[in-house]
A protein has these predicted regions:
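Short amphipathic alpha-helical surface patches that serve as generic macromolecular interface elements
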Residues: 107-111, 115, 136, 140-143
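A contiguous, well-structured pocket-lining segment that forms one wall/lid of small-molecule binding clefts
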Residues: 2-96, 108-120
Length: 192
């Protein structure tokens, strides 16, 4: 890239470049996407599967950035659509909003592509990208997991983690000055 860039600020490179259809088909067709959850992406997966495709491609670096951005938008929109359809099939509450997080949220072009793809699929979800939510996502998740412990509910789900069974992970530690504190009735199973 000229000038060199560590990342595509706001998606400007992707927005001003052409998607390479051959590379996009190769990326979208990676076998990992067909695996059932739980699954996780990591640096090793990217280096093993994606980097070789990029190196073998005849596309310019700018086109590769546009193509990979489109690939991410395809896969995020597809995963959201699958989740919404599963919720409908299993008669679960149908989601009305989705919290997006991670560095990609700061890529305006990527977020616009995801919104467009979801709209094209008939999904009109409110995509939450509020920095006050995104920047504190992990704290909110751990507060939610702690609440599940207080309520005596499993917070480690086999369907998500691959564990053999659901379980309650974590513990509640109260300071000594709260030794006479009474937990709510639902939480009396907890040893403090």
């Amino acid at each position: 890239l000229d000038p060199p860039a560590a990342y595509d600020a706001g998606g400007a490179i992707a927005a001003s470049s052409q998607v390479d259809p051959t590379l996009l088909n190769a990326l979208d067709g990676l076998p990992w996407y067909e695996l059932p959850p739980p699954k996780s992406l990591g640096k090793e997966w990217f280096e093993t599967w994606v980097i070789p495709l990029l190196k073998a491609s005849n596309a310019t670096v700018r086109s590769q950035v546009a193509t990979y951005t489109e690939h991410i938008a395809n896969k995020v929109a597809s995963a959201v659509l699958q989740t919404v359809n599963r919720c409908k099939t299993e008669a679960l509450m149908s989601p009305t909003a989705i919290l997006m997080s991670g560095g990609g949220v700061h890529n305006d072009y990527l977020m616009a592509r995801i919104r467009q793809k979801m709209s094209d699929a008939g999904l009109n979800l409110n995509i939450l990208t509020d920095p006050s939510l995104i920047d504190h996502k992990e704290a909110m998740i751990f507060a939610f997991l702690g609440l599940q412990v207080l309520l005596g509910r499993s917070n480690v789900l086999a369907s998500v983690t691959g564990a053999r069974q659901d379980s309650i992970g974590g513990s509640i530690h109260l300071p000594s000055h709260m030794e006479h504190f009474q937990l709510p009735l639902q939480c009396r199973h907890i040893n403090t």
